Design a protein with these regions (language model features):
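Active-site-proximal cap/lid insertion segments
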Residues: 1-21, 30-168
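Active-site loops and adjacent core secondary-structure elements that bind or stabilize anionic groups
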Residues: 27
Length: 168
């Protein structure tokens, strides 16, 4: 069985100009100008949120042969309270229901991990474009950079994909 792809996890090599790169290019362009008064700039990136479509060079950073999937001991969920299991089950319904089993049976787990890591490297590259423009521009000496993110994604740990779980 192939894992669902239309509504859940999609990945592949695609060299398109996403909103992330557009944001990075625009921010880098603005940072070449000298600010004459206090200025606030927020630059948001979507990656590595789904879908995971990135240029091939980011996938190539993570050869499938080098990727290790998380261990799945039979007792892996024993330490999770019932409320945690229930929450994870509720958020794994619908299109995500049975996703872990499907992706493992289809032999696609390493590919999904590779795609997620490619997304992290892609956003790192986009952020690097912005920071390079800042540090090479006229505003580097009087600028504070603050970075934050919202959450990570479970990638098969405890047989769970997505977020919404009461474990790390």
């Amino acid at each position: 069985r192939e894992p669902p792809s239309s509504s859940v996890v999609q990945w592949g090599h695609e060299d398109i100009r996403t909103g992330d790169i557009e944001a990075a290019i625009k921010a880098a362009e603005i940072l070449t100008e000298e600010f004459t008064e206090p200025t606030f700039m927020a630059v948001g990136f979507s990656s590595p949120h789904l879908p995971w479509h990135f240029p091939k060079r980011f996938f190539d950073l993570y050869p499938l042969a080098d990727i290790k999937t998380p261990e799945q001991p039979f007792y892996d969920l024993y330490d999770v309270p019932e409320a945690g299991k229930t929450l994870a089950e509720l958020f794994s319904a619908g299109a995500w229901e049975g996703y872990h089993e499907k992706i493992v049976e289809a032999g696609k787990w390493k590919e999904a991990l590779q795609a997620y890591m490619a997304g992290i490297s892609k956003v790192d590259d986009d952020l690097g474009r912005v920071l390079d423009a800042l540090y090479n521009g006229p505003n580097a000496a009087n600028t504070i950079v603050v970075l934050w993110s919202d959450h990570g994604l479970h990638l098969g740990e405890k047989e769970h994909w997505k977020k919404h779980a009461l474990w790390e």
